[in-house]
Amino acid sequence: MPTVMAYHDVKDKDHWLASPKREEFFGPLGVTNIRTFVDPENPTRVGLVMDVADMDALVAAMETHAAADAMAHDGVLPETLVILVEA
């Protein structure tokens, strides 16, 4: 089960941190141990570290309208999204 790190910019850090959409979207994909991070020098840059059971399922899910809707709800700026997978 690889650990995945993702970071991106958001419109509102507090809204992003409080949102239930993360668990709603990633939970059914078998993603566990989700931890959130905030850049102390740029609070609109945030990130996640999570354990992913099925990378193919995650990649496919990230290309759906549900992913776009969840990101829009959370104020994620999708053009800034970077995903890194544990080597």
PLM regions and their residue ranges:
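Short S/T/G/P-rich N-terminal loop/turn motif that feeds into the first structured element of a domain
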Residues: 1-87
